Amino acid sequence: MFKDFNISSFKKTKPPSDNSFDTDQEIKALKKIPLRKDFVKKYDNIEKAFEQTAKDNNVKDYDKKIAAKLIKESAPVILELKKYHNRPRPYELDKNLKAVKMKSMNTPSYPSGHSAQGMLIASVLKDKYGKGPAFMQTAKNISDSRNMAHAHYPSDSKNGTELGKQLYKHIKTT
């Protein structure tokens, strides 16, 4: 599905360097975001989050295989970018920054895979089922939860969301 996705522009868009003013500002911004473990846990499992959104919005014929397939197919692109940029997680740079630890945090920080996959899935589900505002809110909550967990810098989430939009655009044009 994404074998011919043009990843080069996302390799050119680099995160701020570890010891930069921008990274320092992002860590300061994260420290102002309260840890909300309940919210973070609710949105850590992307498939379940979208399944719940479908249920809450009375989507009767919801096919949970769609989200699973998009996660599986987009993972190699996301992992390639994470390895390429190799940005440490915020709590790895600032040892005083508390984080909600999750199994999903065992890769580099940039870009946010949850943000990318959330936006990709929300866009596809919106096309298939309607309910655009509900699915897009779930994507936003998934992305926001990563900052609330202190798992990602805001720029990770922003660029992850943009990656998700471009992955969706790729699907629509191929």
Label the predicted regions.
Residues 1, 173-174:
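Short, solvent-exposed mixed-charge patches
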Residues 141-172:
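Interfacial helix-loop-helix junctions of multi-pass membrane proteins
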